[in-house]
Amino acid sequence: GTHVDAPSHYGSVGDYGPPRHIDRMPLDWFLRPAVVLDISDVGVGVVGAERVRQELERLDYHVRPLDIVLFHTGAARHAGTPALFTDFTGLDGSAVDYLLDLGVRVIGTDAWSLDAPVGHMLERYRETG
């Protein structure tokens, strides 16, 4: 099924002020034009702002404030298996910041999470300390 993580799901402090709870999210943000970006070739890991820019350019799509951006990761191929929770593509901070700077307020994915898979995050942590 579908669900929405409000900004407060990710922490209690943000650069833009206190993150909103879901009951404080304007409903009209969820009833806007959307574009689907295909990142299904990436595999396990993350994409950054540059890949998002490339996909928007490939589609010749110019994001307007409050547009919705959806990511097709190909995660559905893992439906019904444990890999659904571990083998997907998330977004790094630069991708999220880029979308927010464009005025995007709703980002969606067909993956289990918008974050990088936990295993990927742990591997990066071991590499960088």
Language-model features: locations:
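Active-/binding-site microenvironments in catalytic and ligand-binding cores
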Residues: 1-129
